[in-house]
Amino acid sequence: MPKANNAVASRARRKRILKKAKGFWGSRGNILTVVKHAVDKAEQYAYRDRRAKKRTFRSLWIMRINAAARLNGTTYSRLVDAMSKKSVEIDRKVLAEIAVKDPAAFTQIVKSVID
């Protein structure tokens, strides 16, 4: 009796891996053994950078808040300290958005927090 192979599942598995490598350059996009390594590495980078993105955006928000705070005669650290003492709970993302989109409102926040 001939050996039955599971060609449908094998083809589906290969297609799934090749689909993830769509747009990869050269043999990294069409030779299965190379594609497997390339896709594995791409997924490692994606995992790492999803976490790094959070740090990057937080530092961007802090830079924006600091720049806007300095225009209002204070610094980021003094502003955040004063906000915590007055128990004003606006997170950095929203505060940076206010600083960029509505500088007048940001100035009001700074004046209300810093006496």
From Swiss-Prot:
The keyword Ribonucleoprotein applies. GO terms for biological process: ribosomal large subunit assembly; translation. Keywords: Ribonucleoprotein, Ribosomal protein, RNA-binding, rRNA-binding. One of its GO terms (molecular function) is structural constituent of ribosome. The keyword rRNA-binding applies. InterPro entries: Ribosomal_bL20, RIBOSOMAL_L20_CS, Ribosomal_protein_bL20_C. It comes from the Bacteria. Pfam families: Ribosomal_L20 (PF00453). PROSITE patterns: RIBOSOMAL_L20. GO terms for cellular component: ribonucleoprotein complex; ribosome. Belongs to the bacterial ribosomal protein bL20 family. Binds directly to 23S ribosomal RNA and is necessary for the in vitro assembly process of the 50S ribosomal subunit. It is not involved in the protein synthesizing functions of that subunit. This is Large ribosomal subunit protein bL20. The gene is rplT.
